[in-house]
Structure formats: C-alpha cells, structure tokens
C-alpha cells in the first residue's frame, strides 16, 4: 500500500473554522473503526489531538493530508479554510502537510482528487519538501483523464463576498447568513484560479509567516525613523 492512513476528522461540517482551537470545553473522540476517529471539534483540533497524544505513541505519524474538501480553497479562501488550517497545524507540529480540495461543480469527481492526492504523496516520498512548506492543492471537478496536468501557482484574490442575507427565525427575530464568496478578481495567468479554470491541478506552496518583510523599513520610517 501507498501508506497506512489514520483518519481523525470533525464529526460535522466545520467549513470556515480557520485555525481555531477549542480551548474552553473538553474534546470528545469517538472511534468508528480501525484508525478512524471523529472529534467534536475543529479540523485544527483533530490534527493537534492526533499528533500530540491521542494515540499515546502507538502511531508514528510522518505526514498530514487534509481533505478532500468538498469545494475550492483558492486565493483568499485559505485564510478561512479549515482544510488548509489542518495542514498548517501539521506544519506547526513539524510534519510535511498537504491540503487537498475538489473545486466542485456538477460531476463531483472525488475519485479524481483522490488519485491526485496519491500522486502527490508519491512525489513527496520520492523527493521530500521542507517541512516548513504547506502545499495547497485544488483539483478541477473533472474525470481524471480530462485533467491537463499540474501547475505550480500563486494565490489569486477574490472580489469581496456578497452582502449578508437577513432572514427571520420562527419567533420572528432577525438572523443573518454570511453571503457567498466573491468571484476571482486577481485570477490571471499564474494564479490558482486560472490554473483550475483551465483544467489544471493547482499546487500552491504556502508558508505560515505572514510578515510583509519588504515593508519593515517603510513602517520604521512611518513610525518616525524609530526601528529599534
């Protein structure tokens, strides 16, 4: 086999959970079969538990694969994505990590994304990348045979999301739904949006450091020249 897989997943959909950890209530884990567990927490909780003590040293993890997410994680999505956040947590804990998402349209070709994930694992086994790098992989919703290949990409950028939707609960009180994500704004050649739209698997290298290093001196001047 390619690998021995241990599944630790949220017990329900936690889309948009980002990097949140559950700190104010205890987490409960249910076992649904050999090496298959569900947690009443976030994707980040799942990875943290799996690597940091859930198995009491019985399992030696060497990689984190998050997904397959039912939907795109392109551009700004990575800031909100629980799928990407789970991979980031794996990197925090010192393991190579991949986030896999299927850009679902109509066909829902999860078998395509699974095959791409297997190929990515083989590549990493043969030529490991530095553990500080996280790969964000988005797979077009196509039969595998129709994929045009893989592309190394950068994150694009979306238009702002649609306005919130106001509704009423059964008691007539107002409730609000967050509007859907905006379409691609920066979606030209070289972006993850462009690759997927043209039938390519997008592979974007991510890092945790959000510092805008080129602006450090500019901010020092803005602060009055004090950059001590």
Segments (PLM) and residue ranges:
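Electrostatically charged, flexible surface regions
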Residues: 112-228
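Glycine-rich phosphate/pyrophosphate-binding loops
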Residues: 91-113
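Glycine/threonine-rich flexible loop motifs
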Residues: 72-81
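A cross-family phosphate/adenosyl-ligand binding-site feature
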Residues: 1-53, 60
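Short beta-strand segments
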Residues: 9, 40, 66-69, 100-101, ...
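Short, structured loop/turn "capping" segments at alpha-beta junctions
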Residues: 58-61, 97-99, 127-134
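Short glycine-rich anion-binding loops that position phosphate/pyrophosphate groups of nucleotides
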Residues: 13, 42-43, 69-72, 142, ...
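Hydrophobic/aromatic ligand-binding patch that stacks against planar heteroaromatic rings
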Residues: 86-90
């Amino acid at each position: 086999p390619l690998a021995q897989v241990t599944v630790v997943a949220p017990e329900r959909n936690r889309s948009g959970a980002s990097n949140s950890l559950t700190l104010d209530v205890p987490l409960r884990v249910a076992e649904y079969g050999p090496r298959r567990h569900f947690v009443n927490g976030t994707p980040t909780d799942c990875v943290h538990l799996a690597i940091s003590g859930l198995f009491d040293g019985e399992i030696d993890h060497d990689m984190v694969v998050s997904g397959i997410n039912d939907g795109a994680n392109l551009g700004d999505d990575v800031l909100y994505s629980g799928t990407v956040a789970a991979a980031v947590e794996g990197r925090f804990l010192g393991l190579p990590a991949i986030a896999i998402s299927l850009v679902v349209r109509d066909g829902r070709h999860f078998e395509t994304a699974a095959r791409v994930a297997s190929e990515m694992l083989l590549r990493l086994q043969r030529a490991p990348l530095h553990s500080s790098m996280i790969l964000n992989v988005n797979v077009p919703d196509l039969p595998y045979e129709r994929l045009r290949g893989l592309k190394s990409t950068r994150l694009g950028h979306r238009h702002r999301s649609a306005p919130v939707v106001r509704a009423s609960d059964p008691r007539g009180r107002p409730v609000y739904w967050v509007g859907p994500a905006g379409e691609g704004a920066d979606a030209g050649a070289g972006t993850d949006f462009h690759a997927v739209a043209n039938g390519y698997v997008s592979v974007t290298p991510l890092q945790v450091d959000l510092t805008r290093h080129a602006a450090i001196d500019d901010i020092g001047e803005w602060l009055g020249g004090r950059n001590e």
